[in-house]
Curated annotation (Swiss-Prot):
Family: Belongs to the CsrA/RsmA family.
Record's protein name: Translational regulator CsrA
GO biological process, one term: bacterial-type flagellum organization
Originating gene: csrA
GO MF annotations in UniProt: mRNA 5'-UTR binding
Length: 72
């Protein structure tokens, strides 16, 4: 893992087309601006983990429960 120190207004580059800039520093939090291609999905880690968990639940679906649904 690479650890980098940045001040407000400073940036770091990832590859040729991703730039992350420190916009604001508060007590215990940092606001970042991310300039990246629109095709790239950017998620907070906690949201990513939540999506992964929901995907796991969806794969555990039991189709036999559909037998109890009456059609109109």
């Amino acid at each position: 893992m690479l650890v980098i120190t940045r001040k407000k207004g400073e940036s770091l580059l990832i590859g040729d087309d991703i730039e992350i800039t420190v916009v604001k520093l508060d007590d215990g939090s940092v606001k970042l601006a991310i300039d990246a291609p629109k095709k790239l999905t950017i998620l907070r880690k906690e949201l990513y983990n939540e999506v992964q968990e929901e995907n796991k639940k969806a794969t555990n679906f039991n189709p036999s429960i559909l037998k109890n649904i009456k059609s109109k």
